[in-house]
């Protein structure tokens, strides 16, 4: 019996226990079949994160024989609804000789896989984005400490409908400066005044103002 590389190399994410205990988390049910999708580009994962999928673990390894049945088996074990797999052919093949002295080439792949569950609690938010502190390269690029970078825009959210994009930098909500620590406080303060707010953003170095109607 061949070992399952997806099981042997699987690691739960650091926040798995929080995800597991969250009543909003939707795990794979006993009668369900997990979806297995193959990505060409690692950036494509954001398309699925924006639909409310969240990672619970991953398995990364090199193999010449990993099968789809094996990834399905591991997905069922950890109750993942979706697995995103990226395969990259390694530059060199390995020459093997069988008992009859015939040479065969074995092609090996670098395989990266992410196991995900669903959580639609993001629809309870008023804006529908995930933001964080400006990374060092943006702090240096824009010569500023304040502001937040948009890591994710949920599909069909108020931010999505207003055409806010991933990697935009939000500098103000209405006339108030924002940064990671005060962003939610300012957003909630301004929402109490009106569901219509103006976001000042930096996109590719250009200042823009985007009107957003808060709430789903």
What are these regions (language model features)?
Residues 4-57:
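Compositionally biased P/S/T/G-rich terminal and signal peptide-adjacent segments
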Residues 53-94, 164-166:
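Short, well-ordered alpha-helical segments
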Residues 54-56, 79-80, 108, 124-126, ...:
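Extracytoplasmic
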Residues 75, 129, 139, 150, ...:
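Terminal peptide-recognition signature
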Residues 83-85, 159-182:
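Conserved PDZ fold ligand-binding element
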Residues 90-124:
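Short acidic, glycine/proline-enriched helix-loop-strand junctions
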Residues 110-148, 152, 213:
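PDZ/PDZ-like peptide-tail recognition elements
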Residues 118-120, 171, 184-216:
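PDZ-domain C-terminal substructure recognizer with occasional recognition of PDZ-binding tails
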